[in-house]
Curated annotation (Swiss-Prot):
One of its GO terms (cellular component) is excinuclease repair complex. It comes from Herminiimonas arsenicoxydans. Its main location: cytoplasm. It comes from the Bacteria. Keywords: Cytoplasm, DNA damage, DNA excision, DNA repair, Excision nuclease, SOS response. InterPro entries: GIY-YIG_endonuc (IPR000305), GIY-YIG_endonuc_sf (IPR035901), GIY-YIG_UvrC_Cho (IPR047296), Hlx-hairpin-Hlx_DNA-bd_motif (IPR003583), RuvA_2-like (IPR010994), UVR_dom (IPR001943), UVR_dom_sf (IPR036876), UvrABC_protein_C (IPR050066). This is UvrABC system protein C. Residues 209-244 form the UVR domain. It is found in: Cytoplasm. The UvrABC repair system catalyzes the recognition and processing of DNA lesions. UvrC both incises the 5' and 3' sides of the lesion. The N-terminal half is responsible for the 3' incision and the C-terminal half is responsible for the 5' incision. SUPFAM superfamilies: C-terminal UvrC-binding domain of UvrB (SSF46600), GIY-YIG endonuclease (SSF82771), RuvA domain 2-like (SSF47781).
């Protein structure tokens, strides 16, 4: 009886390639261990995928990856734009080894002007709607707040919460320092306030000259009507706006919305510096540092910088605002990519590679910013990598990829058993990863039982991981001694996880940094690294960050509980009435300051109940 022949994986792959359709779609390469190597998109799947299996590949890195391909998957899409969207979702979710990856950042902030009778100006992150006006996006929260300060100085728009606005009886401090026109107490008519809002919107859209002309005409009209007080107020607006325009060192020469993007590659890393011009004002920049740059599959005629630029355009703009003009320091020839992006945003995008005048200065500044940011990263990275390596060596951990070394640290925080919270912070890629931090509200335990709290958070965190859903870290750091570590061991045994990953950090005498002892549960003896140890300094940094994160969450939870608890103790005050009181008076402090008459004016609050509330709170 003859042996059954094992199919050749390469033959299966080539057979799959031969049967691919000439349609747009996304392809995925896997190695023999089912690890995802690469995700790509194509206008013609058969033509694009076949090009990887030619005998003479231009790039050695591409040839190295192709040798590892043991399986191929494809997904057919209706268009290349749809393929682009799917490709980037897969890259962000699955993080293939040979794709350049830009980590998801927090959403960009906007400046929002609400659509109310007297609109409010506010800092905003999140999805936009059609009920309000949104300006941006801005590269940083600081840029939004600076713009808000300008609008306060020039147009005196309100920033107060609606609950505060609805219940004021006299102007606040902002009116006294000429930062608000006090619409809350009718110091300005709805028509005049609407005009200020309209001028503010024009200013943000880059129509500053038009705003100045409108204000000057308004001032002259008041003067002709002998309304000198109103004319003086408009004159003050004109002076404030003129000062702002004079201070704007970045004169756009009429441009409205532009993004300037500079890519620098050095030392196996890359920096993409994105500068933003919105409404004709240069708002600053933000640096991005993609990973997997050293695995870029470059073709002979394409540079690594061009590949990074293409990856940034695809991953960054696929779900974000795209201005009509992009100024780039690296030339790319990707008509399909730009067509897909234009289909996504619904307008034409103009690419400029050789700008002139002020635009050239912007690009040079963006490029210089990228160079400085990358130099700083490489310097810090050398130090960070050294500390990471020292920690790995001190714990005698066998780590395949030091870049992927991951630590998760847990801490419990409460005040005499009240508002117990657990925190989990993450150290990955040689740095703390704020976006992966998590807080856990701890319930159904005896107040002050830290062991039960630790058990609950570890079970909630790693039960999914044990079932194959999630990432297991290389080290699980527990802020505590033998008791906490033993509780962690019990959880890991129940879940069938490796107990050698658990490391406890027992505080030293006087809780001084450098005197900590590392505690293990797999038979290793306790270890004191010494206060000069770089590994211990890294452990202390991670542990302290977990402690800080837990305390801030606990304090917020405690404050929220205390804000409502005094009202909850009053008979006749249920959830709905409590909510109405807090909304009407802007919080518990406002309820305490309210008179019996004010309290009884709230819907659902009788005179007798108002008197009861007043007595209970005083």
């Amino acid at each position: 009886m003859s042996d059954i022949e094992t199919p050749d994986p390469r033959a299966i792959v080539l057979d799959t390639v031969a049967k691919l359709p000439n349609l747009p779609g996304v392809y995925r390469y896997f190695d023999a261990e089912n690890n995802l190597l690469y995700v790509g998109k194509a206008r013609d799947l058969k033509k694009r995928v076949s090009s990887y299996f030619l005998k003479n590949l231009a790039s050695p890195r591409t040839a190295l990856m192709v040798e590892k391909i043991a399986r191929l998957e494809t997904t057919i899409t209706r268009s290349e734009a749809e393929a682009l969207l799917l490709e980037n979702n897969l890259i962000k979710t699955l993080q293939p080894r040979y794709n350049i990856l830009f980590r998801d950042d927090k959403s960009y902030p906007y400046l929002k002007i609400t659509g109310q009778k007297f609109p409010r100006m506010a800092y905003y992150r999140g999805a936009v709607d059609k009920k309000n006006q949104y300006f941006g996006p801005f590269p940083s929260g600081w840029a939004v707040k600076e713009s808000m300060q300008i609008l306060q100085k020039v147009f005196l728009l309100r920033t107060c919460e609606d609950s505060v606005f609805a219940n004021r009886t006299r102007p606040c401090l902002l009116h006294q320092i000429h930062r608000c026109s006090a619409p809350c107490v009718n110091y300005i008519s709805q028509e005049d306030y609407a005009l200020d809002v309209d001028n503010a919107a024009k200013f943000l859209r880059g129509r500053q000259t038009e705003v100045l002309e409108v204000l000057q005409a308004k001032m002259l009209a008041y003067a002709e009507e002998l309304k000198f007080e109103q004319a003086a107020l408009v004159r003050n607006q004109i002076n404030a706006l003129s000062r702002v325009l004079h201070q704007q060192s970045m004169d756009t020469g009429g441009d409205a919305d532009i993004d300037i993007i500079a890519v620098i590659v050095q030392g196996g890393r890359a920096c993409v510096n994105l500068a933003m011009v919105r409404g004709g004002r240069h708002l600053g920049d933000r640096a991005y540092f993609p990973t997997h740059v050293d695995n870029v599959l470059t073709n002979a005629e394409e540079s690594v910088a061009a590949e990074v630029m293409k990856a940034f355009l695809a991953q960054h703009y696929i779900d974000k605002f795209i201005p009509g003009t992009l100024i780039l320091n690296t030339e790319i020839d990707e008509p399909e990519l730009m067509l897909a992006l234009m289909q996504q945003c619904g307008h034409r995008i103009n690419l400029i590679f050789q700008p002139q005048g002020p635009r050239r200065q912007w690009l040079e500044m963006a490029q210089k910013g990228a160079e400085i940011s990358l130099a700083r990263l490489l310097s810090e990275q050398g130090s960070q990598q050294t500390r990471t390596r020292m920690l790995v060596d001190a714990l005698k951990i066998d780590v395949e990829d030091i870049e992927a070394f991951r630590v998760e640290c847990f801490d419990i925080s409460h005040t005499q058993g009240e508002a117990t919270q657990a925190s989990c912070v993450v150290f990955h890629h040689h740095a703390m990863q704020n976006g992966e931090y998590r807080r856990y509200n701890i319930n159904d335990i005896t107040p002050g039982d830290d062991y039960a709290a630790m058990r609950q958070v570890l079970m909630r965190r790693y039960e999914k991981v044990a079932n194959g859903d999630g990432v297991m870290p290389d080290v699980v750091l527990i802020d505590g001694g033998k008791g906490q570590v033993e509780m962690a061991r019990q959880v890991f045994v129940e879940l069938g996880l490796d107990i050698s990953l658990i490391v406890g950090v027992a505080k030293g005498e006087g809780r001084k940094v450098g005197l900590e002892t590392l505690v293990f549960v797999d038979g290793r003896a306790p270890q004191e690294l010494g206060k000069e140890s770089g590994a211990l300094m890294l452990i202390a940094q991670i542990r302290d960050e977990a402690h800080r994160f837990a305390i801030t969450g606990m304090r917020a939870k405690r404050a929220k509980a205390r804000q409502t608890s005094r009202l909850e103790e009053i008979e006749g005050i249920g959830a709905k009435r409590r909510q109405k009181l807090l909304a009407r008076f802007g919080g518990l402090r406002g309820v305490v300051d309210a008179s019996v008459e004010d309290l009884s004016s709230v819907e659902g609050i009788s005179r007798q109940l108002a008197e009861d509330i007043y007595k209970q709170l005083h």
